């Protein structure tokens, strides 16, 4: 290998690197890129001092495209001799010029420099002195094309980097030179250990960018795999920012939650808690330049975001259990519960083998700390009230934690979503509760937390959220009324207080369903002839429940009862008529449509009998 460049070149190059690292906010306000432009001028001086690129490489530069830069393009050779060494150093300079132009938002110029870097390196890409720089240049081009929304091109560059890393490790394996070493004297070269650390960091970045590209392409399985690998490697090489690592692990948990892989989701969230606890406690490094303790706002925001991921974990696990155990009217099916209890024994027997197949974060003390968090949280579906309550309390703990940051003043949408999740936790817990009075109290808690939101919200700006809450409050009152009716049915003769309570709940449910339906009307207060796909099912359910509610009003006045039956029939008829003219609606409410048809058939006869009875009296 040829000797190091002269002192002038080395000094200018090191000065350029130092200027490149100056943070933008440390530049004059009117010249935010002053240090970047200074670094660029020095890099251009270094390039001039190194001399022109070898001719054969220059000629190839114009024809190179991302696909041609795949590994199969020409056999690699060692970077020996003065010409090869000059090409290497020029490539390092071109790389830094490329990054410099991208940092100053001159993307096309940045791309040109990076492509020139690859052209100079291509013949030597698998050599000890080139492989790291070649991968870094391709990674940066991958990011650049990703920002241009050219995701396929970005993917080509990044997958090429991954393949080159794998080929190098398989065929050579020894730690390659870091690009900066081409401008260092022999006595200042890096140790093998430091080279390995830096090369592995480059590859970790490659996996991280691939995860983002696959996510963008909706290749979610692949994205999750690469994200998991990235997080695992960051811990192994101690190259991570605790706050950023924790939020990425918590975000990954959402993928596993949606896949109903609760053991993996729990592991990600437990690891997120442990690593987030390191915030502000680790020594700042090149990888973690910011001292996180100086960012209280961001700290509390990230803490709230991780808490919201935990809420989703608890809620989804409970809801999945409910779906597995409910009958066709949404009540607990004891036979299904017994079947799941039998399955539980099998799940516990297989727990260890499932755990071994799952990717685990950390080793030694870190692994123990993560396991300690995991052991306090169940990952199997709750099968009874006590198990469900355990998850509910954990979810509620994180609701309070999330609300500390996501307050109504400043974070309206986030705050409302957290409250809706809290309500949903009570709703699913009520499914596991056998005592009907206690179930009523749970629905009452839901209403108490949701009704104030309606008062604070401007329906003009928050129409969608407003509708969601109106519908949910209506449903809570509806469920409470059903429970009170079921309790009353067990009495010989319900007293006037019980009747009054049932009618009051009925009226409240009607009020909120009507508010929801009225929100669908046009500015002239006319109900739409065609209901939008996004609100079709809730609108049809609201109509069905309004019809049922009118039929459930308890009154001693025959005339009033006849009016209620007529209103009930009107709403049932609307559902039947709408589904006849809009067949797509029938698929959304098959059960309710069949019941509506029955009521449209039965109610007129019932009303006639009622009129005849009234005439006789």
Curated annotation (Swiss-Prot):
- Keywords linked to the UniProt accession: Cytoplasm, Cytoskeleton, Developmental protein, Differentiation, Neurogenesis, Phosphoprotein
Q: Where is this region: Disordered?
A: 48-83
Gene3D superfamilies assigned:
Tetratricopeptide repeat domain
Q: Which GO terms describe its molecular function?
A: kinesin binding; protein sequestering activity
Q: Which InterPro entries match?
A: KBP (IPR022083), TPR-like_helical_dom_sf (IPR011990)
**Biological process annotations from GO:** central nervous system projection neuron axonogenesis; in utero embryonic development; microtubule cytoskeleton organization; mitochondrion transport along microtubule; neuron projection maintenance; transport along microtubule
Q: Where, per the database record, does this protein carry Phosphoserine?
A: 174
For whether the record's keyword set contains Phosphoprotein, the answer is yes
Pfam families with a match to the protein in the record: KBP_C
Its function, per the record, reads: Activator of KIF1B plus-end-directed microtubule motor activity. Required for organization of axonal microtubules, and axonal outgrowth and maintenance during peripheral and central nervous system development.
Q: Which family does it belong to?
A: Belongs to the KIF-binding protein family.
Q: What is this protein called?
A: KIF-binding protein
Q: What is the lineage of its organism?
A: Eukaryota, Metazoa, Chordata, Craniata, Vertebrata
């Amino acid at each position: 290998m040829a000797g190091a460049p002269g002192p002038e070149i080395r000094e200018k190059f090191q000065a350029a690197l130092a200027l490149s690292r100056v943070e933008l906010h440390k530049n004059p306000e009117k010249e935010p890129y002053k240090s970047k432009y200074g670094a660029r001028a020095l890099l251009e001086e270094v390039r001039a001092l190194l001399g022109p690129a070898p001719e054969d490489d220059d000629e190839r530069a114009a024809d190179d495209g991302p696909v041609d830069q795949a590994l199969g393009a020409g056999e690699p050779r060692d970077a020996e001799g003065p010409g090869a060494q000059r090409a290497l150093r020029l490539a390092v300079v071109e790389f830094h010029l490329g990054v410099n132009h991208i940092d100053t938002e001159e993307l096309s110029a940045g791309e040109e420099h990076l492509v020139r870097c690859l052209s100079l390196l291509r013949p030597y890409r698998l050599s000890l002195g080139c492989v790291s720089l070649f991968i870094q240049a391709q990674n940066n081009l991958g990011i650049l094309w990703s920002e241009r929304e050219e995701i396929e091109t970005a993917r080509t560059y990044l997958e090429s980097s991954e393949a080159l890393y794998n080929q190098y490790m398989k065929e050579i394996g020894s730690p390659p030179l870091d690009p900066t070493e081409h401008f260092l004297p022999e006595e200042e070269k890096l140790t093998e250990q430091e080279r390995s650390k830096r090369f592995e960091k480059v590859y970790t970045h490659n996996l991280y960018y691939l995860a983002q590209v696959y996510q963008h392409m909706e290749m979610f399985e692949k994205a999750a795999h690469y994200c998991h690998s990235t997080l695992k490697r960051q811990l192994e090489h101690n190259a991570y920012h605790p706050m950023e690592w924790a939020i990425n692990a918590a975000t990954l948990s959402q993928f596993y939650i949606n896949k109903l892989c609760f053991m993996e989701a729990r592991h990600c969230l437990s690891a997120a808690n442990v690593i987030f606890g390191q915030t502000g406690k680790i020594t700042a490094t090149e990888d973690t330049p910011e001292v996180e303790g100086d960012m209280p706002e961001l700290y509390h925001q990230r803490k709230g975001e991780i808490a919201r991921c935990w809420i989703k974990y608890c809620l989804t696990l409970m809801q999945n259990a409910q779906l597995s155990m409910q009958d066709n009217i949404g009540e607990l099916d004891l036979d299904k519960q017994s079947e799941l209890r039998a399955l539980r024994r099998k799940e516990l027997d297989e727990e260890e083998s499932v755990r071994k197949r799952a990717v685990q974060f950390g080793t030694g003390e870190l692994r123990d700390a993560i396991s300690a968090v995991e052991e306090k949280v169940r990952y199997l579906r709750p099968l009874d009230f006590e198990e469900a309550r355990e998850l509910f309390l954990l979810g509620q703990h994180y609701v309070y934690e999330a609300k500390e940051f996501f307050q109504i003043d400043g974070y309206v949408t986030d705050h409302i979503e957290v409250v809706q999740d809290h309500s949903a936790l009570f709703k699913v817990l009520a499914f596991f509760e056998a005592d009907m009075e206690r179930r009523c109290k749970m629905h009452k808690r839901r209403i108490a937390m949701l009704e104030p939101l309606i008062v604070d919200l401007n329906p003009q700006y928050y129409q969608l959220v407003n509708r969601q809450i109106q519908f949910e409050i209506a449903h809570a009152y509806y469920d409470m009324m059903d429970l009170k009716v079921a309790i009353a049915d067990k009495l010989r003769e319900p007293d006037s207080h019980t009747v009054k309570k049932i009618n009051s709940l009925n009226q409240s449910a009607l009020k909120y369903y009507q508010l929801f339906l009225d929100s669908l009307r046009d500015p002239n207060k006319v109900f739409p002839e065609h209901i939008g796909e996004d609100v079709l099912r809730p609108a049809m359910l609201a109509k069905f429940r309004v019809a049922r509610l009118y039929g459930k009003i308890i009154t001693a006045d025959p005339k009033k009862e006849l009016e209620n039956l007529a209103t009930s029939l009107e709403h049932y008829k609307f559902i039947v008529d709408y589904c006849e003219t809009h067949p797509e609606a029938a698929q959304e409410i098959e059960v309710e449509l069949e019941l509506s048809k029955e009521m449209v058939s039965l109610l007129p006869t019932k009303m006639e009998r009622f009129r005849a009875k009234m005439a006789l009296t």
